[in-house]
Amino acid sequence: INLNIFRLGEEMNKLLIGDGGMGSELRFRGVEVPSHIESIWSALALTTNTQIIKEVHLDYIEAGAQYITANNYAVTQPILERADLANQLEDLTLLSLSIAKDAIQESGKDIKLAASLPPLETSYRADLILDYSKMYDQYQELANILEGEVDIIICETMAHSLEAKAALSTIQDSTSEKWLGWTLHGNRSNTLPSGENIIEAFEVTKDLKCDAYMINCCGVNMVT
């Protein structure tokens, strides 16, 4: 995962080291990670390989990560429904948090825990976003599960300004840090998959409380 994090306020110039991708590490360790287009992707390991998920978290901590991200990406209602796991939203989300918390405790280090408000539908597909009210309601359900459980909530891999607004709006009163992460499109510099310029997208969310902005899940050449 490629992250450029822009923190606001007093922390603005402080380097924060995060973890890396979960899916690629699971594959490297022999775990089946199906295509993100047709499945729950790396979240499948929550049903089959929880110990390896914890090992990935521990390895990132050992490598110097100051925060780790729970493996709840793709744990959304639309994606779970496609995998016949529609009634597992809360259970799988809480399981991902429990695994990460166990890793932090086992490490004995002061590590922050993050979790995702990911795209509700297939990642990078701005054309698949739901209407705003449905997005808001589904993000609110996820936000309610995460509230009080994590240090950071990341609105992650946002491909459309309204998707980002819906996700970020549901955590305005959260006690967790609020991060907003955009993804960029192919070789189109500064452009979201929706076709919006990132500055235009920022205008839609600029009045919402946000502790950090970031660019993720795109080539390093797009953000440097």
Residue map of PLM features:
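Domain-level signal for soluble alpha/beta catalytic cores
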Residues: N4-T224
